[in-house]
C-alpha cells in the first residue's frame, strides 16, 4: 500500500501542470491540485509511515526518507509561490494568522477545498461551508457554537510562549513563569489563543443585523460582542460542567443555549476579513451560505511535518528552525527565541515534545489531532 501511495503521488506530481507563476493562484483554476500539492501529500504519507503505528522498531531510514522528501518538497513549494501567509504582518493578537483561513487566494493553501454561497437549484450546485454557522453563538443567528475542551484552553501557551505551569502534559518542556489562573484563562496567552477561542467580552464582528428578529438578538453584526455570562436556577449546579440546560440561563438572549467558551478558530471575522465569504440570512439561515475555503494541507503543516521528520532523523537544528518560523508569524521575536526554550536542538526528546505541542496549538480544530494521536499511539499512553 505504501509503495502504491508513493507511486500515485509521484505520478500526480509529474502530471499536475504549472502555470507561469508555478501554481494555480487565480481565476477558475485556483484550488486545483498542483505538483506542490502532490509533494506535500507525499511528505504527510512519509511521516505517517515513519511513525510508531507503522514503525514499531523505529527504523531510522524511514525518518531519513521522510526528511529528504519533505526537504525537496519545500523547494518545489517555494518555487511555486507557497509559503506562510501574512508572515510579515502578525497584526494584533495574530489577526494576520486568523485571516489566512478565509483569504482567497492564499499562498498558505497547498491543498484547498473551495465552497460557494449558492442556494438550492436545478441542477443543485450548492457547496456551502457550514463551519461559520456552527461556531457562531445563537444570539448572532448562528447554530449555537462549538465548545472547546477545558484541557485545550488550559494548555495553550502563555504570552512568553511556554506551556502553563499548571498543565500536566508535555512534562519534558520547561513551564512558563507567568501565573495561570483558571478563573481568568484569557490573561497573558499566546496570540493564537484569542483567535482560537471566544469568551466573555470578545468582539466578534460580522456582516448582518439580526436585531430585527427580536430581543434574543441584541447586537447588530458590526458591533457584536459576546457576553456569555451564565446564571443558574439552582446554586447546586454551579460547578457541574454536565449541568442540564434547564438550570442554566445565559445573558444577551443566549438563554439555555449559552456556553462558557466558544471555538473561534477559522472564523470569518469582519474585523479580520473585510469581505465576508458568507451571505447572511437574519431570518433563518444565519451563516449557512458560506464560501469560506477549507485547507486540508496548509504550508504550516508542511513545516511541522518537516520539523518532525528532521527531529527524528537527527537534524534537530532544522526542526527548531521550522518552529521558529511558525512562531514568528504570530508575533514572537528572536530576542526571546520565539517563545521556545533554549537547547531544543541538543535534546531530541524535548525537541519532539515541542513539535507535538506546536502541532496541537497551531493546527487546533483543523482535523489533525486524531491522526497525530493514532500514529504516535498516544491513546494508550504513548510508546
Model-inferred region functions:
Residues 145-159:
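Extended substrate-binding grooves/exosites of carbohydrate-active enzymes
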Residues 1-144, 160-383:
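Acidic/polar-rich alpha-helix caps and helix-coil junctions
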